[in-house]
Regions:
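Phosphate-binding chemistry for phosphorylated carbohydrates and sugar-nucleotides
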Residues: 1-188
Length: 188
């Protein structure tokens, strides 16, 4: 599917371009267009009111390019590239801005399903989410026999869980997220 999917990416004048291009290429996505007007670092963020991937307004130039190239998915990262926003093409030609909870649920389902299909889903699989994030992901995790750990807001608490899993060897970390558009799919 990756070879057929058309993606538009914008770093919103931040540092994410090189990282995002590499990550998308490694994931098998061959058709990635970058919003050139937002590809270089600009401390004034001159083409966007707020460089926040949670905001649909931040996707204006990505949506414009997306319509031009027929993109299926639009991706934006905030200036320091630690939050990722996504919009998906709708049947009517518009783009739907996904919430952090929706992105987290899609990622959890995909990761768990891919591991299940490959026969690599550990019996002690664990996911982490902040306490303010959706419980839908808990239900997704449970449907695969995985355990969900709810932690306080802040990735340092997800990191503490990962460290605990590694020290105790009691769970295998699969992914973690916060509804504020932060995701971590592999231990660091």
């Amino acid at each position: 599917f990756g070879k057929d999917m058309k993606i538009v990416y914008t770093p919103l004048h931040g540092t994410g371009e090189m990282l995002a291009r590499r990550a998308l290429a490694q994931a098998g996505f061959d058709s990635v267009q970058v919003v050139e007007a937002q590809a270089t670092a600009d401390p004034d963020f001159s083409t966007v009111k707020s460089p926040n991937p949670e905001s649909q307004a931040a996707f204006a130039l990505a949506e414009e390019l997306g319509r031009q190239v027929g993109a299926d998915v639009l991706v934006a990262t905030d200036p320091d590239a630690d939050r990722v926003g996504v919009e998906v093409l709708q049947k009517d030609g518009s783009y739907l801005n996904l919430s952090g909870n929706q992105i987290g649920a899609i990622m959890a389902k995909y990761i768990l399903e891919a591991h299940k299909n490959a026969g690599t889903l550990p019996e002690n699989a664990a996911l982490c989410k902040s306490i303010v994030s959706t419980d839908l992901v808990t239900k997704i995790a449970e449907s695969y026999g995985a355990t969900m750990f709810n932690v306080l807001t802040g990735f340092k608490f997800i990191a503490e869980k990962i460290q605990e899993f590694e020290e105790k060897h009691n769970h295998t970390y699969m992914m973690g997220f916060e509804e504020s558009f932060g995701y971590l799919i592999k231990p660091f």
